[in-house]
Amino acid sequence: MATAVAEALENEQHLVVEAGTGVGKSLAYLVPAVLWALEHRRKAVVSTCTINLQEQLVNKDLPLLRKVLDREFEVVLWKGRGNYLCPMRLQRAIAQSDGLFTSPERAELERLRGWAETTADGTLSDLSVEPDSRVWAEVCSEAHICTTKSCGTNPRCFYQQARKRLIAADVVVTNHTLFFLNLDGSADPDDNDAGGYLFGNDFVIFDEAHTVEAIAARQLGLAVSQYGLRQALQRLYNPKTKKGLFQVLRQADAVRATAETLDRVEEFFDRVGERSEFSEKKREIRVREPDYVEDTLTEPLLALQARVVQLVRDQDDEVLKGELQDLGRRVRDARAALSSFLKLDSNDFVYWVEQTGRTQRTHTLNAAPVDVAPYLRSLLFRGGRTCIMTSATLSVGGEALEYFRNRIGAEAVPGLQIGSPFDYERQMKLYVVAKIPDPRESGAYEKALARWIEHFLEMSQGRAFVLFTSYKTMQAVAAEMRERLDDLDYKLLVQGESMSRHQLVSEFKKNKRHVLFGTESFWSGVDVPGEALSNVIITRLPFAVPDHPLVEARLQRIEARGGDPFSSYSLPEAILKLRQGVGRLIRTRSDKGIVVILDPRVLSKGYGKAFLNALPRCPVEVV
């Protein structure tokens, strides 16, 4: 793998590599990447999906490489601006605190002032308790406020200091979302060289590349949320607290206009909710016709934006001017996205409304390209550059990475597959349960699930991930099993109840009798080596919900082009997801354990063999 990466860099070519768990793929791409960066004065950008892998690269792999190579090189973990405190904005917020904040928020501001004097890097991760989001929004770095001109000479401006290190770095570690957010060159706007992606002289390596398609679709699309628009406007003026920037400026007319616009926002999104036929099972509704609801927001948003522009012109205070300009841009961007959504601007996009929240429901207008391949082909796989994609799970079984390469626009890019060195015949056993109802018989299936989960938990004495495809099913099974598992002295951890994903994994590792119930985010990117995880239970084959608007649009496009939506999309996507879930179990050469599939379709359906053939070769027992 290292040789293939070195050759791709040498020849300014692209590469897709599937490297099985245990290959040591991070070092295999880091060694040639670092050497190439140093010898050719280039910048290596390594993008991952998870924080875990970023931390592994920065704290373990790259320091090890520094010792082995006996070469000095600069590494920066690149975080988004919103993670950094801006001292200039903090001082402005303190000076205007009476007009901006309520009493509890002012107490929070004081806590941040004390922390700002002692923090080493000024980022959210350095705070022991996450700050109030409203307060943090007033003091974090913002692109048009915290600039090189306003903050560049301040040694305590954490973002500007980080930016200097970023530009000087040999290796930049970041995440996929931030990468695509900055793909227009805004990472280093002073560097206009067209020879790279973010910095002019860079090349990029995407690890955990199986997530690139989904993340790119989000970043290339649009989203206007009721919550986000409300938060932005309330920074201008919040009628409930009677605080905000217009209150500081004593602009009575602007205060009234903002309060009225906030009412229009709530009314508009209420109409969106009424127009959409949501249910407990259906939280996303596809929009197929323009003017889904009447556009009653553009006019008040435009009027509010005009007020902000006028106040900017009248303002002498550069800091306040920057704050107004930033909020004015947010209003403008929301207005443009709203207009694009209501017009259904692009035939290549799918549009939908999403409902979130269980008690206080809010709505988001979404749009995303049905197919990201044409976009990524031109953005990433251009001539004279090097983009390397790698992951442990890119293939769907004997097809030379063709499916993945087609999905991301890398059809012409060479592919390389390297198998895992692990001895799965010895380390892993697969159980497939035939004596269980079809998952589509939900009532009988859920009752049987609890019985079979308990059976296999006894076999491994807990120490298990139980992976679900439905949050609702997970909650129902957890409620049914909680007391019984407690009696058996297993500690049940359930995603979404109280702890974050990171906290759940950390807690899981502490006790050998833990059982963790998880959905989407636990199928991949979670690493628990050793005895703590000895059992992975797959409750259902992970087919994507076919009526999710984006999935539905992709299936319809395949059908319209004469293809078979099931074999061309639904099945390969589910196979990849299953491979990722099963891949949680064996992380080192000494790991041992069992994988359980509680879905009889893997035996009863013709496509079942495709799932089994895509898994590592190991002993299989049907029960």
Segments from the language model and where they lie:
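Conserved pre-motif I regulatory segment
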Residues: M1-E18, A28
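Signature of the SF2 helicase/ATPase Hel1-core->accessory helical subdomain module
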Residues: Y29, L35, E55, K60-P63, ...
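A substrate-engagement module of RecA-like helicase motors
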Residues: L38-V172, T177-F180, L236, T241-Q251, ...
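Conserved RecA-like ASCE P-loop NTPase motor core of nucleic-acid helicases/translocases
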Residues: K43-N52, M389-T390, G462-T469, T473, ...
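A contiguous, basic/glycine-rich beta-loop/short-helix subdomain that forms a polymer-engagement track
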Residues: W136-V172, F180-A194, Q310-I436, Y445-R451, ...
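Conserved RecA-like P-loop NTPase helicase motor core
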Residues: V433-A444, G496-V602
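Conserved helicase motor "Helicase C" RecA-like lobe of SF1/SF2 P-loop NTPases
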Residues: T469-G496
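N-terminal targeting/trafficking signals and adjacent low-complexity tails
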Residues: V596-V623
